[in-house]
């Protein structure tokens, strides 16, 4: 038999196997090594532990450094700044050198890692994944794909345009996303601070109630949907998604090994078929497709150029 014929035979056999066994295999895929990295990074990002006791926000030199993931500046344990909040504050004025730093560091993160940051280095993404592990009926988001474009609207309107246009006398932008939409601000900021600070408890009002409702909706949604905030509303994920295809950290599909069984597409919780678009904007590099692949055709790669050949074998 020719190589093409052998590949087709293997594909047919594995296709049968994947249909019968993939659901069981998905249940056995071990995600805890990645969750371990997520937990470690969340701990490092919020390593100012004394803040949780004193109810005070850390304001040291490290707070001038942006972390790559969505982590609230106002979290009493936060050792670094949230890139979204920092960008909103300075986007309205070029007189702040800090604005160039924020923009540059975001682009650097995106070009180096893309949405690998979402899959490994975002505390709020990890939080949603843990909620999704709660035993309950799970719903697919494949039919809700149009909602993924909402996060780009959030990025454009709430993170760029409104802070750019609505600036104070000092040239500082109003952080619309942080104030009116971000649930991480309630989870990491308002809630822990209010537990130890009576003044903050007394100041909580309608805006807190609104954002608490958003957080509750995200929590409930995360139990049945996989990472709904990441898919539909996160502006930081939207920014990294724009750079996913050109980032140095990419996914590679070896078409000589790929047998088009579809196991990777069925395993992907971000609704991506990696054999068609290895570096899709929604791919968070979680590695589920790699572990589901029966022929080890999918790999991580780091470097210039997209070496993936996405042409899969067809009859």
Model regions and ranges:
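Single conserved hydrophobic/aromatic residue that forms the stacking wall/gate
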Residues: 1-12
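Non-ligating segments of multi-cofactor redox enzymes
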Residues: 15-275, 281-315
């Amino acid at each position: 038999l020719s190589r093409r014929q052998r590949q087709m035979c293997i594909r047919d056999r594995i296709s049968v196997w994947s249909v019968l066994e993939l659901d069981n295999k998905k249940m056995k895929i071990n995600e805890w090594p990645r969750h371990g990295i997520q937990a470690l990074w969340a701990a490092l990002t919020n390593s100012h532990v004394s803040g949780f006791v004193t109810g005070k926000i850390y304001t040291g030199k490290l707070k001038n450094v942006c972390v790559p993931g969505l982590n609230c500046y106002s979290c009493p344990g936060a050792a670094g700044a949230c890139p979204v909040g920092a960008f909103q504050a300075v986007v309205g004025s070029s007189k702040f050198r800090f604005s160039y730093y924020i923009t540059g560091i975001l682009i650097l993160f995106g070009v180096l890692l893309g949405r690998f940051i979402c899959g490994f280095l975002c505390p709020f993404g990890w939080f949603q994944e843990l909620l999704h592990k709660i035993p309950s009926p799970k719903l697919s988001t494949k039919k809700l794909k149009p909602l993924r474009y909402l996060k780009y609207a959030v990025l454009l309107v709430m993170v760029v345009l409104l802070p750019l246009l609505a600036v104070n006398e000092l040239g500082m932008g109003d952080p619309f996303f942080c104030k009116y939409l971000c649930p991480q601000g309630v989870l990491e900021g308002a809630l822990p601070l209010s537990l130890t600070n009576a003044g903050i408890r007394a100041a909580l009002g309608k805006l807190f109630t609104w954002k608490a409702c958003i957080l509750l909706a995200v929590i409930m949604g995360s139990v049945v949907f996989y990472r709904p905030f990441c898919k539909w509303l996160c502006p930081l994920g939207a920014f990294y998604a724009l750079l996913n295809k050109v980032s140095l950290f990419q996914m590679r599909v070896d078409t000589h090994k790929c047998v088009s069984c579809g196991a990777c597409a069925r395993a992907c919780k971000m609704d991506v078929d990696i054999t068609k678009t290895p570096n899709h904007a929604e791919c968070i590099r979680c590695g589920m497709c790699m572990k589901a692949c029966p022929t080890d055709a999918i790999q991580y790669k780091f470097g210039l150029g997209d070496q993936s050949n996405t042409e899969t074998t067809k009859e």
